[in-house]
């Protein structure tokens, strides 16, 4: 989406991810309140539109969230967004779109989810419950397992290589107070954890979590009015829908991620080698390897070398998932994309303490896919490019 005027992040908020005993509306409220307080907002009616992403819980999630803040009523349009794992990021996209087009000067995007209190089966992640692939057991873990075995066949990668992704991301999460799983784990421990779908062992699969995140966005004029001291600019944002494939294709690629990232680079004027921080959709270890290549961080087939050479960790070309990624942070479906953005904002502001990426990161990118459409293709993909300063 071409931004018609400059848009900035005013404030962000998030809850700790994991298992919660309070419902999605309470979690969403906590994150939204944090984001608004961090934006120096002294009156709730300053927010002119609200978008709330949710994957599995309620048809009026947004109204439930803002009801408890006394913000429901005729002067605040609250729009609910459903797009599976991409829902939270898409809610932020919609808020950005409002500000970019001049519809509002200050908007909020929220993602919230509680799976502990609202259990769902893996079939719920399909674009259609009657989809023949899902009916025959082709759920997400199985699809990523097939991609992993093909990648191993083509590149010579081993299950131990895949396990290195979990080891890296768990190490990144060590000092992150919001992460669910943290602390050192070895390649052997990852490989020897329970097999789910070869070669995906349990520790190579993200944990489905509860949690929420929120992002307040506004115009440049509004940022100055609010006295935002550490501005973060939205350099670009792209939402894509996946193509339908009815023929054989390369399952080690990801058409929707390639298309979305190419458009984002063009829109923002920023190339993959200029990105300092990347939060990507590492729902499974193999996903991170494939996305290195799909987003142009390295050449096709060089993802494993990129990992082994330390290019995706501190001191490398681009720190991938410094918060710990979905593999360590947990994955509350509708909230994950918004949390990626919130964490990138904190990194660009230098607020991440023990897991801060260097003293002066300037560019941060986030990527999240949502649902399944056909074969290994995703139904949706949302990407944001953020830069430090005005």
Swiss-Prot record:
Lineage of origin: Bacteria, Pseudomonadati, Thermodesulfobacteriota, Desulfuromonadia, Geobacterales
Reaction catalysis annotation: (S)-2-benzoylsuccinyl-CoA + CoA = benzoyl-CoA + succinyl-CoA
InterPro entries per the UniProt record, alphabetical: Thiolase, Thiolase-like, Thiolase_C_2, Thiolase_N
Name of the molecule in the record: Benzoylsuccinyl-CoA thiolase subunit BbsB
SUPFAM superfamilies membership: Thiolase-like
Positions of the record's site feature: Increases nucleophilicity of active site Cys: 331
Organism name: Geobacter metallireducens (strain ATCC 53774 / DSM 7210 / GS-15)
Family assignment from sequence similarity: Belongs to the thiolase-like superfamily. Thiolase family.
Top-level taxon of the source organism: Bacteria
Entry annotated with the keyword tRNA processing: no
Quaternary structure and interacting proteins, as annotated: Heterotetramer composed of two BbsA subunits and two BbsB subunits. Both BbsA and BbsB are essential for enzymatic activity.
Active site (catalytic residues): 85 (acyl-thioester intermediate)
Function: Component of the BbsAB thiolase complex, which catalyzes the thiolytic cleavage of (S)-2-benzoylsuccinyl-CoA to succinyl-CoA and benzoyl-CoA, the final step of anaerobic toluene metabolism.
Pathway annotation from the record: Xenobiotic degradation; toluene degradation
Binding site for CoA: 19, 121-122, 194, 205-206
GO terms, biological process: catabolic process
Assigned keywords, A-Z: Acyltransferase, Aromatic hydrocarbons catabolism, Transferase
Enzyme class: transferase
Gene3D superfamilies: 3.40.47.10
Domain statement: Binding of CoA to the BbsB subunit induces conformational changes of BbsA and BbsB, which may directly affect the turnover process of BbsAB.
Transferase listed as a keyword: yes
EC number: 2.3.1.310
GO MF term set: acyltransferase activity, transferring groups other than amino-acyl groups
């Amino acid at each position: 989406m071409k931004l018609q005027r400059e848009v900035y992040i005013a404030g962000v908020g998030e809850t700790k991810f994991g298992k919660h005993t309070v419902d999605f509306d309470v979690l969403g409220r906590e994150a939204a309140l944090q984001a608004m307080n961090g934006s120096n907002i002294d009156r709730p009616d300053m927010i002119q539109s609200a978008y709330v992403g949710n994957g599995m819980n309620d048809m009026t999630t947004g109204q439930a969230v803002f009801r408890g803040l006394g913000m429901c009523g005729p002067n605040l349009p609250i729009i609910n967004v459903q797009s599976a794992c991409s829902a939270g990021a898409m809610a932020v996209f919609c808020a950005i779109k409002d500000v970019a087009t001049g519809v509002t000067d200050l908007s909020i995007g929220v993602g919230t989810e509680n799976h502990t209190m609202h259990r769902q089966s893996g079939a719920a992640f399909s674009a259609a419950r009657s989809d023949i692939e899902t009916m025959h057991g082709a759920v997400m873990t199985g699809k990523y397992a097939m991609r992993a075995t093909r990648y191993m066949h083509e590149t010579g990668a081993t299950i131990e290589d895949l396990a290195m992704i979990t080891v890296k991301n768990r190490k990144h999460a060590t000092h992150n107070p919001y992460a669910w799983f943290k602390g050192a784990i070895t390649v052997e421990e990852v490989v020897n954890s329970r097999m789910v779908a070869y070669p995906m062992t349990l520790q190579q699969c993200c944990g489905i979590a509860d949690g929420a995140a929120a992002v307040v966005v506004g115009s440049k004029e509004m940022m100055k009015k609010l006295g935002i001291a550490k501005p973060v600019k939205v350099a670009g944002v792209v939402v894509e829908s996946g193509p339908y494939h009815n023929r054989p294709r390369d399952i080690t690629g990801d058409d929707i991620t390639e298309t979305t990232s190419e458009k984002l680079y063009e829109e923002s004027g920023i190339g993959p080698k200029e990105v300092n921080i990347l939060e990507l959709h590492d729902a499974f270890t193999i996903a991170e390897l494939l996305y290195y290549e799909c987003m142009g961080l390295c050449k096709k087939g060089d993802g494993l070398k990129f990992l082994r050479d330390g290019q995706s960790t501190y001191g490398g070309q681009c720190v991938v998932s410094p918060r710990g990624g979905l593999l360590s942070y947990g994955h509350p479906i509708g909230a994950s994309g918004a949390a990626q953005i919130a964490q990138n904002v904190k990194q660009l502001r230098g607020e991440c303490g023990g897991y801060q990426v260097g003293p002066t990161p300037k560019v941060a990118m986030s990527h999240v896919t949502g649902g399944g459409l056909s074969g290994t293709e995703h139904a949706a993909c949302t990407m944001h490019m953020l830069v430090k300063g005005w």
